Amino acid sequence: MTATELMTNWPDPSTNQVPTDGALTFVNTYAVLEVTGEDTEKFLQGQCSADIGSLAIGESVPGSICTVKGRVITSFIATKTNESVLLLIPRVLVPTTKEYLKKYAAFFKVSLNQWLHPCVIANPKSGQLPESLYVSCNFRLGEQGFHAGLLDQASYQKLADLLPSYQDKENQPAPESIWLDHLLEAGWLLLNNKTSEEYLPHQLNLDLLGAINFKKGCYTGQEIIARMEYRGKSKKRLKVISLSGHQLTNESLPLDIKTADDSQPLGELLQLTSNAKLALALLPVELPSEGSFICDGETLEYALQNNV
């Protein structure tokens, strides 16, 4: 089995019982946009909702990059190194995010580099990988903590030599879905090409997840985001809900949600866990804690798992 095969073919979670904490997981769904150069901090401060300027080397913080209208292009986890800032973002959004930032980067001494090789490992310390191999990315989303390792191309090539030690039955990598499910349970939406530029940060609860700093100063979209914080109120927010009824898949999302009598728009179903039992849905703030709605032409029973 080659390194690439191991990083793209995951064990079936229904037949492989693996611990949810401390399991070594190779994550292809996320990749890295690296920002380097002497103006890196100044450039990112003008583009990100997070306070990149306050980051010490080795620290990580969640954030977002928004359009001038305040719509979220991508959310990210930023990690500062000696030479750069690494933005951990959904893989499918790395090229489009890079293209968006290029028009601003032209005025700064910075370079934007895509890491599209398999470069993200969840819980690498638990897998006993050498810490010199990766950049640690420790971050919190609300009350939940996460750990990942970010590999540059050279480190990825070194990792290929270590992979045989993870191919025995007692030390198999965990399926990627475990890590992604944990992010969903924390309320972190995996944005994609369909949902990018569709939502305001408050709708995605980025203000509650520590991804917006309201004291850092101006950045693209900041005026609209600040107005929502101080003068407005988001009528809908992302909610973690349990589901029962009709089986859905992430491939079919996003889907419109209607009231139980199928008469009024209610919100959108945006992401499911691997077993489709939990979901992230954009729903009214004042939604009852449990009930039913119509989605994909079927009635689904729901129960709120968070109190947003």
Please name every model-derived segment.
Residues 39-44, 94-98, 127-129, 154-163, ...:
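Short, conserved charged micro-motifs
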Residues 13-20, 61-75, 105-106, 127-136, ...:
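Short amphipathic beta-strand starts and helix->beta connectors
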Residues 176, 182-206:
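Short, conserved active-site entrance elements at the starts or edges of catalytic domains
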Residues 1-73:
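Acidic, proline/glycine-enriched N-terminal capping motif
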Residues 222-223:
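Structural motif
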Residues 215-216:
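Short, surface-exposed secondary-structure edge patches
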Residues 204, 209-211, 226-308:
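Glycine-rich, small/acidic residue-mixed loop/short-helix segments
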Residues 21-26, 31-32, 77-186:
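Acidic, low-complexity central loop/insert segments
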